[in-house]
Amino acid sequence: MAKSISQETLHQMVTRWASPRPDNYRFKIFKDTSDFFRVEYGSVVVLDEKPFLVLGNAKEGRFGIDDQEKFWVKRSIDLTDGSRKIIKLVFYEKFMAKIGGIPWECFRSPKKEARVLKLVAGHKNFMQGYAVEDEKGNVVRVLDVIKGKTLHAYLQNLESDHQTYFYELFPDILSKYIECIKAIKFLHENGEKHGDIRRDH
């Protein structure tokens, strides 16, 4: 049984890394993340006895569409060291996709994501993080935040004529793109597939 963490201790930890809460504020503490809708702003998720303050749901824009909220993905602060983390809670989504008239089923797999995170640990061309089970056995992924723009956003904001782009900017862009392709090759060589390759990632 995991040790319980007191409200007083949480207030002290939060004050160190974020805006302090009123003295009478009571943090909702989650060791079971099964109902991810209940895990909201100001909650604390405890994973392997480590507390994370939830800052809100992550959002992701897609192909020019405004940011879409991902209710199972939480922005957070690791209260032991103040680092920003993304916490992906378990969400078993399934949907059908079709390319060239061929349909297939797509689904989210927390165990696969956990396996891939372990495989790519320390690889400079992959997001870093780790997986941990909550007290109900849900495989939660804790990810480091990547700062900066996507390649897509970077290219959209370039202002140069074609010749300057092609001779001065493109060689470096292509070199970085090839690194991305080699990273995907690394996954394939190790029996894994990415599953969500998009130009806006």
Feature roles, as predicted:
Residues A121-V132:
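Conserved HxN/HPN-centered segment at the entrance to the catalytic loop
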Residues K136-T150:
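Conserved short submotifs of the Hanks-type protein kinase catalytic core
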Residues A2-F63:
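Juxta-kinase regulatory segment immediately upstream of eukaryotic protein kinase catalytic domains
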Residues E60-K118:
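ATP-binding glycine-rich loop module of kinase domains
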Residues H188-H201:
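Catalytic-loop of the protein kinase fold
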Residues I146-D161:
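Structural motif in protein kinase domains
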Residues C180-L187:
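Conserved hydrophobic alpha-helix
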Residues K176-Y177:
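Activation segment signature within eukaryotic-like protein kinase domains
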